[in-house]
Amino acid sequence: MMAKLMITVMTVFFLSLQQGADGLFERWRKNQMAASRIMGNLITARLDPPGYCTHKICYEDGECNQWCTAGCNPDTGKCDTT
């Protein structure tokens, strides 16, 4: 079982090296940078919703619903944090 896992890990490692060697390194690097930025944004996420969320109903706008940290007001349907 451990040998299969090691073979799988090594295969993925060598395929990633080959991807870089085949001239796709630039694309691979850009994908890695984008993933790094996304993770950075998730770690340092804003605590307040964007200003326009005060005028939108949370449940109808996915981005506002995401930033609505205190939840949606059940009476108005808008963010309680704004």
From Swiss-Prot:
Expressed by the venom duct. Keywords: Disulfide bond, Gamma-carboxyglutamic acid, Hydroxylation, Secreted, Signal, Toxin. GO terms for cellular component: extracellular region. The keyword Secreted applies. Disulfide bonds join 53-68, 58-72, 64-79. Coiled coil: none annotated. GO terms for molecular function: toxin activity. It comes from the Eukaryota. The modification 4-hydroxyproline is found at residues 49-50. Residues 1-23 form the signal peptide. It comes from Gemmula sogodensis (Gem-turris). The modification 4-carboxyglutamate is found at residues 60, 63. It is found in: Secreted. The keyword Secreted applies. The cysteine framework is IX (C-C-C-C-C-C). Belongs to the Pg turripeptide superfamily. Residues 24-46 form a propeptide. InterPro entries: Toxin_Pg. This is Turripeptide Gsg9.1.
